[in-house]
């Protein structure tokens, strides 16, 4: 068995259960052959949704990933709101439910994501992290398998609270280098960063408006603010680029994109603003209401590359 539905799990059937055993436990079990092509296609859809919200997406499996939304593409302040929006988009695009854990580090987020499966979201505030970890059975800790759990039990460690009572030296002596990690997670600490395993191809920001913008002056003013947001984001990631992309979505959900490329790149906020306004000026907005404005930079290069390029051209 590669996987089992929640209905099958009620009969004691889980992934890795031998088929004969599974059928014995649940005689009316329905076996479905795998469709890896469909699985990969849906996973790609989900990944596209993740990428709309953050450049920092670290896939763990085809259907699972860590996202760092501290600086997200849509400038949404609430991580909980982002998680809910992503779950809604996934269901709308695939008719599949998704679970999410909203916390400040990878370990806690992974643990929380399993609390309300198959279709829920868990939010644990920073001051709640220690209590959450303390009550967890040690075998429920992400990264601790059956064999390691037995070793912990032999030491009299059955919960996160038990683990927290042990010193780092004791844990390192028993488990080696990973003992230090066990010491940290018992305290709800995990300093691992979310690492995207893809080369960044663009940096973008966008803003939605409610009510819609239907006055050209307001649209131009709003676009200038989006340009400021894009410049700020470029500074955060230490990048600039040679292609500027404008995205405009209208009230009827139709959208247009326009782009311009400059060999010198778009390094200053004024250059981004001027070029984006030129792109906007070429659009016919008469009688149309704007619901969303977006700007992006492609053909990226880091600041050091920019510096050397400019010096050579001089």
Give a label for each model feature:
Residues 1-62, 66:
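Residues that scaffold, gate, or flank divalent-cation-dependent active/transport sites
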Residues 77-137:
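Long, highly charged, low-complexity intrinsically disordered interaction regions
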Residues 140, 148-292, 300-314:
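DNA-contacting surface of Y-family translesion DNA polymerases
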Residues 1-4, 108-116, 154, 194-197:
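Short acidic, glycine/serine/threonine-rich loops at helix termini
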